[in-house]
Amino acid sequence: MDAIKKKMQMLKLDKENALDRAEQAESDKKASEDRSKQLEDDLVALQKKLKGTEDELDKYSEALKDAQEKLELAEKKATDAEGDVASLNRRIQLVEEELDRAQERLATALTKLEEAEKAADESERGMKVIENRAMKDEEKMELQEIQLKEAKHIAEEADRKYEEVARKLVIIEGDLERTEERAELSESKCSELEEELKTVTNNLKSLEAQAEKYSQKEDKYEEEIKVLTDKLKEAETRAEFAERSVAKLEKTIDDLEDELYAQKLKYKAISEELDHALNDMTSI
């Protein structure tokens, strides 16, 4: 009789232990289900973020295309301006040669060239005006440098956002590993949930690989944009320098032509005076 009571007590104890294990397994199952749902929500959120990343990459592609077009236009403008400079240099050479010939004819009237010195003073004042314009152009370049710094700041902000996404992915992976460790302690009823967790893990790793790939593509686009921006800035600088050279050469040509015309008038006046003097001497 005592043996039967003892056996019944053991059976009762086994029953209570079995109930405790069942409750624990049920609790673990519920926790795994909750964690699985949370991971699925995180997966959906991450997919949305990746979609946003793809949109930003498209914008970078458009920006790269625009930068290439601007670079081509600036290089064409610089080439045209350099051609104009060469043409103006040839015109200056011809005008200078003609001026040299005029100065040789006016060698006997050097005493009356004080007015030419005044014209040189006016040319110096004109050069000062050109220098003031150059200073304004330098201020414009400084403004463009400020705008470029702002663009770099925007790019750095984009890098910071991608680093934040990568950090969150690392946190999610850590949470997932801890979830897998707890899931291994569950009873056989949790096996199906474990398979689902493995699937979610694979999806997260795949998404992480995609995020890394997009990050590398973005870095490449940013580097290409930076190179093209530097080339564009160089081409614009060449074009601005060529334009300033053209303006300066045109002003020089105008001054030389004015001086040549004035010298011709002086030569004509001196010739007339000499003719009058010769006529007076002949009359005497």
From Swiss-Prot:
Modified positions (N-acetylmethionine) in chain numbering: 1
The record, for InterPro entries, names: Tropomyosin
Query: Coiled coil: which residue ranges?
Result: 1-284
The family database entries (PROSITE patterns) matched by this protein are listed as: TROPOMYOSIN (PS00326)
Q: Name one GO molecular function term.
A: identical protein binding
Q: What are the alphabetically sorted keywords of the record?
A: Acetylation, Actin-binding, Coiled coil, Cytoplasm, Cytoskeleton, Muscle protein
Residue ranges with Basic and acidic residues bias: 12-40
**Where in the cell does this protein reside?**
Cytoplasm, Cytoskeleton
The ranges of region (Disordered) come to 1-40
Sorted alphabetically, the Gene Ontology cellular component annotations on this record are:
actin cytoskeleton; cytoplasm
Q: Name one Pfam family in it.
A: Tropomyosin
Q: What is its main location?
A: cytoplasm
The record's comment on protein family reads: Belongs to the tropomyosin family.
What is recorded about the domains?
The molecule is in a coiled coil structure that is formed by 2 polypeptide chains. The sequence exhibits a prominent seven-residues periodicity.
Q: How does it assemble?
A: Homodimer. Heterodimer of an alpha (TPM1, TPM3 or TPM4) and a beta (TPM2) chain.
User: Any idea what job this protein has?
Assistant: Binds to actin filaments in muscle and non-muscle cells. Plays a central role, in association with the troponin complex, in the calcium dependent regulation of vertebrate striated muscle contraction. Smooth muscle contraction is regulated by interaction with caldesmon. In non-muscle cells is implicated in stabilizing cytoskeleton actin filaments.
List the protein's name. Answer: Tropomyosin alpha-1 chain
Report the source organism. Chelon auratus
Q: What does the organism's lineage look like at the top? A: Eukaryota, Metazoa, Chordata, Craniata, Vertebrata
